[in-house]
């Protein structure tokens, strides 16, 4: 899986919008009935791009068109700064898989893994996953359907996709883009 291109200008810390997809129905009594659809939020990451040079914008445009084909193929977006994250989704148990990818690069080896919200011991693999992502390995595979999450300190590297449509504007041989690009988090 590809990694979002490294730009010559470091972008400021992206804005993250979380969506829980809660269905809210007004009852006849005036009360609300609320149903949570997702177990974890789906996030939209807004990457700021003001003042980028032509080479950076062309790199993003080529990545969007040639590598990702719009929204078709997912990729990883790596935050520039290391931060602490709590109970990030890592996958679902299937009774056979012992190794799970942590949505992080350069995490400290001090991680806490959870299976259905119960702390479970693992071994840590720094950069041993695909695309240099960190991994954790359980002594025995989590049960089928169990939710695997992880708390860590590192550079959050979620799997994302582009929206299917981006607006570009040609201005005297310079490519300019709207002030930001929205990247939509994806889970397999």
Protein language model regions, located:
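Solvent-exposed edge beta-strands and adjacent loop segments
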Residues: 1-64, 155-176
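Extended beta-strand solenoid/passenger and fiber regions
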Residues: 60-126, 153-188
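Intrinsically disordered, low-complexity peptide-like regions
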Residues: 24, 104, 129-132
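A generic structural signal for beta-strand entry/edge sites
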Residues: 44, 97-99, 131-135
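Polar, enzyme-active/binding microenvironments
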Residues: 4-5, 10-11, 15, 110-151
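Beta-strand-rich interaction surfaces with strong enrichment in secreted/lumenal proteins
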Residues: 34-35, 89, 138-140
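Residue-level recognition of well-ordered beta-strand positions that form the cores
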Residues: 48-50, 151, 182
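Secondary-structure transition/turn motif
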Residues: 50-51, 105-106, 137-144, 186-187
């Amino acid at each position: 899986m590809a990694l979002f291109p490294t730009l010559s200008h470091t972008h400021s810390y992206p804005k993250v919008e979380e969506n829980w997809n809660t269905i809210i129905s007004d009852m006849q009594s005036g009360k609300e009935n609320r149903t949570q659809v997702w177990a974890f939020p789906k996030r939209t990451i807004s990457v700021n791009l003001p003042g980028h040079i032509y080479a950076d914008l062309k790199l993003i445009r080529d990545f969007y068109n040639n590598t990702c084909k719009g929204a078709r193929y997912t990729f990883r977006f790596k935050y520039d700064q290391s931060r602490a994250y709590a109970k990030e989704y890592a996958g679902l148990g299937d009774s056979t898989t012992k190794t799970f990818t942590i949505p992080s690069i350069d995490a400290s080896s001090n991680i806490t893994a959870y299976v259905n919200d119960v702390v479970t011991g693992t071994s840590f693999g720094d950069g041993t996953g695909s695309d240099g992502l960190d991994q954790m390995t359980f002594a025995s595979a989590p049960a089928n359907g169990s939710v695997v999450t992880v708390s860590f300190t590192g550079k959050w590297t979620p799997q994302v996709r582009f929206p299917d449509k981006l607006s570009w504007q040609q201005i005297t041989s310079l490519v300019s883009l709207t002030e930001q690009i929205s990247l939509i988090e994806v889970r397999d």
